[in-house]
Amino acid sequence: MKKIVLVGYMASGKTEIGKLLSKKVNLPFLDIDYLIEESLSKTVNEIFEEKGEVFFRKKEHEVFKNKINSKQSFILSLGGGTPCYAENHLFLQKDDVISIYLKGSVATLVDRLKMNKDKRPLLKNLANDELAEFVAKHLFDRNFYYSHCKYTIIIDDKSPFDIVEEIHKILF
């Protein structure tokens, strides 16, 4: 049984890499945001707007805990904040979990986030010139939680295919 959990900040490529890895290793790919949306029949943006972040984080924890304690094999992409709440970071160190932090520099992440920040509840009200400071602060605050991953892969200047190859080497 393989439980591969991809961790990283917004726009680190978790979803794209998860989908590519899924095809390569023949495991189902799951995205925690999609699982939450499916369980509530609402988008993440709608959940944030209607119920607030605290409600969202509680639901996120419940979904993550249920999935990680299941007997299934999968590749799971977490939200950027998932490890930082409700002691979710402790699940990253379970014996049957392979947790991988996709680590990007502030510059890389800001470049990627500028393209679709309207789809990100935490960013949609920020001006582009505020993004770098916001991302840098978040990365600093979240480093403790992200560092609980068993593996770290630097994503700067690498294609998704190169990153998938690095992960494949870890797995096999």
From Swiss-Prot:
InterPro entries linked: P-loop_NTPase, Shikimate/glucono_kinase, Shikimate_kinase/TSH1
Compartment(s): Cytoplasm
GO biological process, one term: aromatic amino acid family biosynthetic process
UniProt-listed Enzyme Commission number(s): 2.7.1.71
Keywords: Amino-acid biosynthesis, Aromatic amino acid biosynthesis, ATP-binding, Cytoplasm, Kinase, Magnesium, Metal-binding, Nucleotide-binding, Transferase
Annotated residues for binding of substrate: 33, 57, 80, 142
Protein's name in the database: Shikimate kinase
Species of provenance: Flavobacterium psychrophilum (strain ATCC 49511 / DSM 21280 / CIP 103535 / JIP02/86)
Gene expressing this chain: aroK
